[in-house]
Amino acid sequence: MTNLLDGYPGHEHAIPIYPLYKDVIHTIAESRMIVTPTLIVSYGGPFAENYFWETEEPYHDAKLQHFMPYEELASKTRRVGAGWFMKEEQVFPKHAKSMKALVEANGLAGIGSHGEFQGMGYHWEMWAMQSGGMKNIDVLKVATILGATGLGLDKDLGSLEKGKLADLVILDKNPLENIRNTNTVHFVMKNGRLYDGNTCDEVYPAKKKLDRSEWNFEKPIRTTEVNE
């Protein structure tokens, strides 16, 4: 609260207290201080990333296997020493309830994946944000226009409007129906250039293959009959 009263424009990481009562929620909302809870590294309890390490299998994700060198992917996903926790020990759904209340009070919020695990971390953070009952449309707003507003970039980014930068993603499935459909990226448009979401090859306005020469380390070839 001292940050807020001193005029800080943003607060990163969750406020490690639950519940946040209406006086706190509405004060934050009316101050227009953006809160980026980074639930993936939740304060006050186990990190949300631990939950996703326990429940997801990122090693087998086709895109990660395509984009990440084998050594990098395997070292980060096959043996994770972050710890195992019973579901009821997780604190991030409680923090997510506070974020739901803040957004519904017209407050500013942002998505921050803290750089824990590239590619999937941002999706995990969105899924964690929804775990407290936030509407899927509000999660998407937090990931786009609300975050852009908090950074002062809403005149250029955050929504599809005439005059804004042509930065967007095209999905195969609707995240309004299931928030986990955020992880179905088919195309990415960056600054008016369209890229294949599975390969990062440019498909418009020119057709150009992604140069993987500096980091394309293949998975080792199996030379025995031993299965994983």
Put a short name on every predicted segment:
Residues 120, 135-140, 150-185:
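Acidic, glycine-enriched loop/beta-strand segments at the rims
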Residues 188:
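Short aromatic-centered micro-motifs
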Residues 1-7:
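Functional cores that coordinate and move charged inorganic groups
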Residues 14-132, 137, 198, 205-207, ...:
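Active-site neighborhoods of metal-dependent hydrolases
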Residues 180, 203-214:
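A short, polar/charged loop-to-alpha-helix boundary motif
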Residues 11, 35, 114, 129, ...:
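Divalent metal-coordination and catalytic microenvironments
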